[in-house]
Regions:
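A short helix->loop->beta-strand "cap" motif at the edges of active sites that frequently abuts
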Residues: 19, 80-83, 99-100
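Active-site neighborhood of phospho(di)ester-bond hydrolases with catalytic His/Asp-centered motifs
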Residues: 23-24, 57-70, 85-87, 144
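Pre-active-site segment of Zn-dependent metallo-hydrolases
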Residues: 19-61, 73-74
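Metal-dependent catalytic neighborhoods of phosphoester/phosphodiester hydrolases
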Residues: 72-81
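Extreme N-terminal starter segment of soluble prokaryotic enzymes
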Residues: 1-4
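Metallo-beta-lactamase
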Residues: 20-21, 27-29, 86-144
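Short beta-strand scaffold segments in enzyme catalytic cores
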Residues: 10-15, 132-136
């Protein structure tokens, strides 16, 4: 399993068997939305992912409804065939951003994406129930 922190904050890229999953993608050079009152910061590259990495993405997982996890422009940059996995609550936020295609609910029973299994687990105070954590297991039984 290849695990890559794809930016300097929240975006994770996992690949096994030529299929990849992105978790909480923020794939922009801009580090805050335009409407933020804070000083705008930018980075030199949108992410550490190569063009080849992008092509391998089969699914996106959104773990929180906050803008640093749910960056609509990054999600919309992928083809509609890329599946989105999230919670029922976060699905509502996606709909408000105009992201309505191919959204699936992930829970503690888990879902297989490529050769990996992803299970949603509850987070602690103060984030639960708005967010979830992940237990990820590859085809060799390795977990993160």
């Amino acid at each position: 399993m290849k695990l890559l922190k794809a930016d300097n904050y929240q975006t994770w890229f996992l690949e096994e068997g030529g299929k990849a999953v992105l978790i909480d993608p923020w794939l922009s050079k801009q580090l805050q939305p335009d409407n933020r009152i804070f000083i705008q910061r930018k980075r030199n590259q949108a992410s550490l992912l190569s063009d080849e990495d992008y092509k391998k993405v089969q699914a996106i997982i959104i773990t929180a409804p906050f803008e640093d996890h749910l960056h609509a422009e990054s999600i919309k940059s992928f083809p509609k065939s890329v599946k989105i996995f999230t919670s029922k609550l976060i699905k509502k936020f996606l709909y408000r951003q105009g992201i309505v295609d191919n959204i699936h609910i992930i829970n503690a029973e888990g879902v297989d994406i490529g050769l990996m299994n992803f299970k949603a687990l509850p987070t602690g105070f103060p984030y639960y129930p708005a967010t979830f954590a992940l237990l990820i297991e590859d085809s060799k039984g390795r977990r993160i």
